[in-house]
Design a protein with these regions (language model features):
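Structural signal for hydrophobic
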Residues: 22, 75-76, 137, 161
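Generic preference for hydrophobic
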Residues: 22, 36, 60-61, 81, ...
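A generic structural signal for well-ordered alpha-helical segments
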Residues: 13, 53, 76, 100, ...
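Catalytic core of membrane glycerolipid acyltransferases/transacylases, capturing the structured
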Residues: 30-88
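Membrane-anchoring hydrophobic helices of lipid-metabolizing enzymes
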Residues: 1-35, 44-45, 73, 80, ...
Length: 196
């Protein structure tokens, strides 16, 4: 279903808004697992990231509240999304993404939440997962419309991918590694945004 949904949504967005531009796709690791972290404001950037990385499927981390209704839960599960408790993250948050990465899958995390505390938790989660799984983090920035109205206004959609960020294995000084990597990710986001 993931492939069908990606191709279908790609067609719909093309008809509404024209072709999307993907920059630096050649920087993606080939045949190796990685974590992609992307800026996030609406459902449109999630869809566009999936389209940009296609045919590589992304397993999206999504807030558990979206899985409360059975129908929505079934759809999200078929679209490779898995739930996470953002308000009370614990060791179990690492289990699913680590299992996916071990199977050489790609995990998508959107750290730009509605609250600064949530953004930090999600960024830290991505860093800890990358360290434990020994996989790189690929920063991505979406620039474009965030509403149906803006899509119809033909505002251009662009996904820009950055250089791989390699997180060292966590030692006793986990906090320093996390903070340093957080700064690198934030700086990468800003640099990618400035490319437009």
């Amino acid at each position: 279903m993931y492939t069908f949904a990606t191709r279908f949504l790609q067609l719909i967005l093309f008809l509404m808004n024209g072709r999307m531009k993907t920059v630096n796709k050649e920087k993606l690791p080939q045949n190796d697992p990685f974590i992609v972290v992307c800026t996030h404001k609406s459902w449109i950037d999630v869809v566009c990231l999936g389209i940009a990385l296609y045919p590589i499927p992304i397993h999206f981390m999504a807030k558990k509240e979206l899985f409360n209704k059975v129908l929505i839960k079934n759809i999200l599960t078929k679209l490779n999304a898995f739930p996470v408790d953002r308000s009370n993250p614990g060791p179990s948050v690492l289990k699913t993404p680590l299992q996916l990465l071990k199977k050489k899958q790609v995990v998508g995390i959107f750290p730009s939440g509605t609250r600064n505390s949530e953004e930090k938790v999600l960024k830290n989660g991505a860093i800890h997962i990358a360290s434990r799984a020994s996989v790189p983090i690929i920063p991505a920035v979406y620039i474009g419309p965030h509403t149906i109205k803006d899509l119809l206004g033909r505002k251009r959609r662009t996904i820009i991918l950055g250089d791989a960020i390699h997180v060292p294995k966590m030692t006793k000084d986990k906090e320093s590694v996390t903070e340093a990597t957080n700064e690198v990710i934030s700086k990468a986001f800003e640099e990618l945004k400035s490319n437009i």
